């Protein structure tokens, strides 16, 4: 059922224009489709990426992205570039497809992934649309290898962001963590307080460094003496890669698995 829903969403998106040969000018409107395009497209195939990918604070791939023109995330912003394929995610459904038809654009609108299977299906869809199925297959094979080699011993872990924010114990983030041998602890409201951090410290704190240098109340929480005194092993992780939870996490999960084993 999940695979059918994913395929249906992709099919509706591609209905904006007839299928053609491999596109030569691809525009991506979304940070998460930027990631897929940069990983899967051939040199010179990308015409534009979203403005967020130009920002080092938001995108781990900003260096590659800055070699390309940025757009503001709207269909209208890429019309002057005359793309033959537009990539986006979770945006507008039928309305966006209708606008695309009026503008003469072919749009691939992916649903937001909920599980690892969705990541693999997204890779298949985008690599096929780009005319580069082998590139998608290579990344899918790497995810499959991680899944086959998932550690049997799981470490009690809390993924920790600013202000005590954490993540759900089920779903895509937890799925990726499990591939590294980390079991996300269930938390009320997906947050951990200083009291629990001190009285029931997890074996491991997976601390996101997303905007770690930014002055804010949430970041100050992580610097609180009580937070710093928690009796847990702490590993830092590149929080930017967890925003989309896409295939750029493959290398991060491999790194974490090596550190934990």
For each predicted feature, which ranges?
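Short, solvent-exposed loop/turn elements at domain surfaces
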Residues: 34-39, 54-59, 160, 165-169, ...
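Alpha-helical, coiled-coil/dimerization segments enriched in small aliphatic residues
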Residues: 52-57, 64-65, 167-192
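A ligand-binding cleft/hinge motif common to bilobed small-molecule-binding domains
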Residues: 92-102, 204-222
